Amino acid sequence: MSWQVRNGWYFPLGCLLVAVAGPSGVIAFQQRTSQQSPRNASTPKLGDSKVNPIDGLRYVWIPPGSFTDGCSQGDKECFEDESPPRKVTLTRGFWLGQTEVTQAAYQKVMGYNPSVIEGPGYPADSISWVEANVYCTAIGGRLPSEAEWEYAARGGTTSARYGNLDEIAWYVHNSDFTSHPVARKKPNAYGLYDMLGNVLEWTDTWYWVQHNQENINPTGPSIAEYKELRGGGWWDNQDLVRASYRIRLETTDLDYDIGFRCAAN
């Protein structure tokens, strides 16, 4: 099968995108593609970015590496399910949305906007895991694992937050009880905005009360009752707006402080 390159994203020529009814009536997209890998793809590096031609959002390269996952040293606000901290190694780099998925992008891809707090540059909110997963699949991506999310959010730091909270995040003490347009606060060292605060972000990892003990490319349990969200939101107190904070919800749950960002291989 031949591959077409559009703005650095690989799409197989002749790919068939099929719409099917998913859970809760959501339209899902299934791609019938070859398993063949594109050839001669250059290896990206930290600082590289590209625009996805489908949703128009920018994605940044997160290189492989190791980090301490879970409760940060000296963090007195941790919950039991954030411990014990352990060294995790991600052997594969990945692309991650520079911002949370905006309402303009969501409308463009999905054809509707379920958000309660409306504005094209605001993060899409009131999004279930099912809908977030459909969106990321439709643009040729996926949701990040919880390990990928935390590694990217920390941006090479080892503390609970990657900067002064008021400078990097919208949370209950500075949000005026609403979300805000993306990328209005300072990014982390990887160039990612709003990894903490604004809206909670879905991951692709099933929640397990014991902190995952896998150390290499952890994926979590194969099935469980809840999916995991990260980052805290505009409604949360500062003790919940930390890199290691974990929250879980059912895949069809949604609220107006819940959004997401996509990853891609």
Could you tell me what each predicted segment is?
Residues 2-15:
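N-terminal Sec-pathway targeting helices
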Residues 17-29:
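Hydrophobic alpha-helical membrane-insertion segments, chiefly the h-region
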Residues 32-42:
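Ser/Thr/Pro/Gly-rich low-complexity linker/stalk segments immediately outside membranes or between
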Residues 43-63:
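GGW-centered surface loops in extracellular recognition modules
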Residues 50, 54-55, 79-157, 175-193, ...:
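Short aromatic-cysteine micro-motif
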Residues 65, 72-74, 101, 113, ...:
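Acidic glycine-/aspartate-rich tracts in secreted/extracellular proteins
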Residues 75-88, 178, 196-265:
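Surface-exposed recognition segments
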Residues 133, 148-166, 173-174, 202-205, ...:
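An exposed tryptophan-centered "aromatic clamp" motif
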